[in-house]
């Protein structure tokens, strides 16, 4: 039995998230369907670095699976690329040690959120970015983001549905890239993220850019450890990308 690590990208628009769910189309289900077919009906389970929600995309999701087939990683990559739908891409496949674990071995992740700042709605980007036709002061967003850097209890910045007991996470950096006059990308790097955390942080920073909240409001929300204390809305899923997963 050999363990394989794969880096995949996918367009989340047509999936009900990554994780297998009954009677719905998910990324995991499509990959496991292809692997099971390759293994002549024997079920093959796939483990990912983490789940993504309905409509969320991935540029660098990492998965692992075990196989007893005597084929090279390169052939696995080619076969899976052919046997999975066009909205999933296998960027790399490689053999890894048996103790590699896509989920428990992570030491950091990067998420990016794409904001389209056009006055007129662009129907061709509706599934891949948030349309935000309002004025934004990027300098205010950067000031606000500094209050979030470091180790904090992010209870106020995650969904009440978060299953983790500890809400303490470390944010290494938040960077802002103005790719052109219309596109703002916010990049979040940290040792881990809670359910809806990046989308809530994005909504908070957008409010800061409009002057609705101040850096002090963010500090107070962190100390309050109560999602109800924060007025910012959760940004919608379509602008969010799992960009990269890091391992030791």
UniProtKB/Swiss-Prot annotation:
Its biological purpose: Formation of pseudouridine at positions 38, 39 and 40 in the anticodon stem and loop of transfer RNAs.
Similarity comment: Belongs to the tRNA pseudouridine synthase TruA family.
Annotated organism of origin: Listeria monocytogenes serovar 1/2a (strain ATCC BAA-679 / EGD-e)
Gene Ontology terms describing biological process: tRNA pseudouridine synthesis
Major enzyme class: isomerase
NCBIfam families noted in UniProt: hisT_truA (TIGR00071)
Catalysed conversion reaction: uridine(38/39/40) in tRNA = pseudouridine(38/39/40) in tRNA
Enzyme Commission code(s) on record: 5.4.99.12
Name this protein carries in UniProt: tRNA pseudouridine synthase A
Gene3D superfamilies assigned to the protein according to its UniProt record, in alphabetical order: Pseudouridine synthase I, catalytic domain, C-terminal subdomain, Pseudouridine synthase I, catalytic domain, N-terminal subdomain
Residues that bind substrate: 111
PANTHER family: PSEUDOURIDYLATE SYNTHASE, TRNA PSEUDOURIDINE SYNTHASE-LIKE 1
CDD domains reported in the protein's UniProt record: PseudoU_synth_EcTruA
